[in-house]
Design a protein with these regions (language model features):
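N-terminal acidic leader/helix
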Residues: 2-30
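Short, mixed-charge low-complexity intrinsically disordered segments
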Residues: 39-82
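Intrinsically disordered/low-complexity terminal segments and short unstructured peptides
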Residues: 1, 7, 27-28, 64, ...
Length: 82
């Protein structure tokens, strides 16, 4: 049975801070969530739990993870939130 894991990311893109959400169907490590979300090619750690992008210009980290129901997943997708 697949799970619905709502992951909230914090990103530093240039001078801007940004947050985004994505729904994954398997529980994994914070690095693997970042790797899948940003297509990271290698583990380039800026500090504990924070990773550089492939160019070494922007940073990403997992802010939170939460298991959600199938109904919550459908609602978030319908609203375009995740």
């Amino acid at each position: 049975m697949t799970k619905n894991i709502l992951v909230t990311f914090d990103m530093q893109i240039g001078d801007y801070e940004h947050s985004d959400k994505y729904i994954f169907h398997n529980k994994t490590t914070d690095y693997n969530y970042c790797k899948q979300f940003w297509s990271l090619k290698k583990k380039n750690k800026l500090e504990e739990g924070v990773y550089w992008d492939n160019q070494g210009l922007n940073a990403i980290s997992v802010y939170s993870t939460q298991e959600i129901t199938e109904q919550e997943t459908k609602t978030l997708k319908r609203l375009g939130v995740a």
